[in-house]
Amino acid sequence: MGQFSLFGEVDRLARLSQLGDCLERLKIINWESFRPELQAATSKERKSKAGRPPYDVVMLFKVLVLQRLYNLSDDQTEYQINDRISFMRFLGLTLNDRVPDAKTIWLFRDTLTKAGAIERLFACFGEQLETQGLITHKGTIVDATFVDAPKQRNTRKENETIKNGEVPEEWSDHPHKLAQKDTDARWAKKNQETHYGYKDHAKVDADSKLITDYAVTSAEVHDSNEFENFLNEKDQVVYADSAYVGKTIPQGVENCVNEKGYKGKPLTEAQKESNRQKSKTRARIEHVFGFITGSMHGLTLRSIGINRARFNIGLTNLVYNMCRYSILKRKGPLTTG
């Protein structure tokens, strides 16, 4: 078998493009716009110029985007970059370049997490979407979805202690055991389904289906908890399901929250029809969560703790927006549909 030549690599990449390499759609992203925030979050003066130079921060950020797009572990990410020429092209790597190993990927993500960088990176991209007129603010949809975390095998007593905001005494005496325990995640039940982990509260632009804001909480927090924090003077109309009834809506914002029926006071036919009309728009946020669950291979966590959950869920929302942006730009002028 002959060696893989430069011409062979070029031919293979050309063929991948013909077959439809979905990662090429993300070339439209201005990756360099993230560099200032990435450098600020990772800036650390090198003690010596000896040894290998550090990896480029934008390339490492693109590794995290790849990882979230395909929902890969650190080890799987390292392997897939080495194995898949489409991944290498997306990262700007050749067969002769070093590939970040699993530990490097973990350390980079951990550094960004500790710096609280994901909120700024999300906002950075959001500003670009605003500037390009993709976020219209004509309609705003608010909803929340569960994000399951690795289930903990705790005793009932330990769970009660955690629920009270305390750490079981036995865990405090064993730091290694405590490091493997998630004291921030919570159990919750909805529609006969039980979940353990966190919630992604999202605010979505109705026209573009872009996420304009989000908040991360533990799973037991009510869906409507972040509602009032999301709304501002830019919003014209707000849509939400009946779980959000009774929440304060700023003056000037049209209330299109679905009405709720009560015992002894069911909804009238007119109210039911009104809810059906509102739901035609409100359902667009389900398309967002559906894309993440399907095209982005699931909305789950491998991490432990609220800080890592905030980073990973924030990254999920950012990567979704990148994918949605590439779709909108291919469609041309923005239309509702």
Feature map (PLM): residue ranges:
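Secondary-structure capping and boundary motifs in well-ordered enzyme cores
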Residues: R15, G51-M59, D97-P100, Q277, ...
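Helix-centered, glycine/charged polyanion-binding patches within enzymatic domains
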Residues: T161-K163, Q236-V237, S242-G314
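Basic, short loop/linker segments at the boundary and entry of helix-turn-helix/winged-helix-like folds
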Residues: E24-V65, L69, T104
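Polybasic low-complexity intrinsically disordered regions
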Residues: Y79-N82, G92, P100-Q251, N258
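Trp/Phe/Arg-rich N-terminal binding region typifying the photolyase-homology
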Residues: R46-V57, N71-D110
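C-terminal domain-tail junction helix/linker
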Residues: K157, I306-A309, L315-N317, C323, ...
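Charged, often Cys/His-bearing segments associated with DNA-binding zinc-finger transcription factors
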Residues: M1-F34, A40, L328-G337
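Arg/Lys-rich, glycine/proline-spaced intrinsically disordered segments
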Residues: K47-R52, K260-E269, G332, G337
